[in-house]
């Protein structure tokens, strides 16, 4: 995969709430180990976070920006090499697990989803809309937007995101947002108790207007 810097990407300068960065580092250290994460952070000039991760607050505390997040994820992709896809899926899932455990109140599922009375297809849509609402509320706290919406076909939902932190300031010849793919997978499992296939089918890093994830309406198991 060929990855370069995308200059003048307005998304790159969006403010990043500290907790997002913290959860990502907590996920990556599970795969890389402490020494590996330290080396990775040093390689992108962010060694100040190697021992003391960012705050766990859903606020902009450390003046992190989206391009800081994407630098770390792209560096991890390089370190992981041929196993980058699986490792980033896994890291994204672990990050989402931390998010739901620590700040699940930001992602309140509707009552019919919690009671499991609704059909599974509707549960998936409700889950995705709950995520967008939660992320949008967090973005508003930071004084910016979270430009996302859901599209539906017979067999799939499509999660569109114009303000993706994973590929902010990045240009590539393939989709690069496997970390968020894993995050979506784990979030859906947390909401519904089921595993769903999530595949990124469009990416801002490839010149698309939005990153798009295709999500099956039907579980794997």
Residue map of PLM features:
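N-terminal accessory segment detector
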Residues: 1-156, 165-175, 204-210, 217-221
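Residue-level detector of functional hotspots within protein domains
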Residues: 134, 184, 199
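A residue-level signal for beta-strand positions that form part of recognition/binding surfaces
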Residues: 156-158, 195
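Active-site helix/loop of acyl-thioester processing domains in fatty-acid/polyketide metabolism
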Residues: 178-194
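Low-complexity, intrinsically disordered Gly/Pro/Thr-rich segments
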Residues: 194-203
């Amino acid at each position: 995969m060929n990855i370069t810097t995308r200059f003048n990407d307005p998304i790159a300068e969006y403010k990043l709430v500290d907790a997002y960065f913290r959860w990502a580092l907590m996920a990556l250290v599970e795969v890389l180990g402490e020494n590996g994460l330290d080396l990775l952070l040093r390689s992108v000039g962010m060694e100040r976070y190697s021992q003391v991760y960012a705050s766990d607050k859903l606020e902009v505390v450390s003046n992190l920006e989206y391009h800081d997040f994407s630098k770390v994820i792209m560096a991890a992709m390089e370190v992981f090499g041929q196993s980058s896809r699986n490792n980033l899926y896994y890291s994204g899932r672990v990050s989402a697990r931390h998010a739901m455990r620590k700040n699940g109140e930001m992602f309140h599922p509707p009552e019919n989803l919690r009671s499991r009375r609704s059909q599974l297809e509707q549960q998936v849509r409700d889950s995705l809309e709950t995520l967008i609402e939660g992320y949008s509320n967090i973005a508003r706290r930071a004084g910016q937007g979270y430009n996302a919406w859901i599209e539906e076909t017979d067999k799939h939902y499509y999660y569109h995101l114009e303000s993706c932190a994973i590929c902010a300031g990045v240009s590539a010849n393939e989709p690069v947002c496997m970390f968020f793919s894993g995050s979506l997978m784990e979030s859906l499992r947390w909401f519904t108790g089921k595993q769903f296939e999530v595949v990124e089918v469009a990416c801002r890093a490839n010149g698309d207007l939005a990153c798009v994830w295709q999500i099956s309406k039907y579980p794997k198991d």
